[in-house]
Amino acid sequence: VQLSWVVLYDDAGKVMQSIGFMRDLTAQHNAQKRIKELAYTDVLTGLPNRLLLSQRVETAIADAQEQSGGFAVLFLDLDRFKIINDSLGHPFGDRVLQLVAERLQTCLRQTDMLCRLGGDEFVIYLHGGNATVAEGVSRRILDEMLRPFTLDDMGFSIQCSIGIALYPHDGLSVDDLIKQAD
């Protein structure tokens, strides 16, 4: 709620009238919140997008430089996903991507971040992750993806490819790390 007042004076400077205005800002607040959500999240999966990933990794880079630490970035894409879209349609493929996102999320810690770049490409930021952690998470993901998916009474499996990049060894920026992991 926004309150504002206007005071009206006569020629002698004496208050003649005082008018108060009250404005409900709920709709404006909700619109700003929605704009922020759209700016930072993937519409299909609800996951963070590249912009939010970039901010998170830039913060991690600053922290790692101060503390001489590191982290890992995984680049994941679904193998032969185009076949699903071409044979079963994009709406079905979109639902598959949502299922994949849910399943990937179960393989991560709360401090990690799963992002969808677009299409069938995902990036995972592993907070404080080293090569051992990155390999363990990658194996967990590969094992989880081997479990069959079921959608519209149809069972199918999806394989994925995962690349790993470690900060600072494989790159000093978000783009370098993603490129190296890809």
Predicted regions located by residue number:
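PAS-family sensory domains
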Residues: K14-D24
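Signal-transmission coiled-coil "S-helix"-like helices
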Residues: T26, N30-K33, D175
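Flexible loop/coil segments at beta-strand boundaries within sensory signal-transduction domains
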Residues: Y9-K14, D170
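Conserved long alpha-helical elements within nucleotide-processing catalytic cores of c-di-GMP signaling
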Residues: H29, K36-Y40, G46-A72, D79-R109, ...
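Cyclic nucleotide signaling catalytic output domains
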Residues: L114, R140, E144, T150, ...
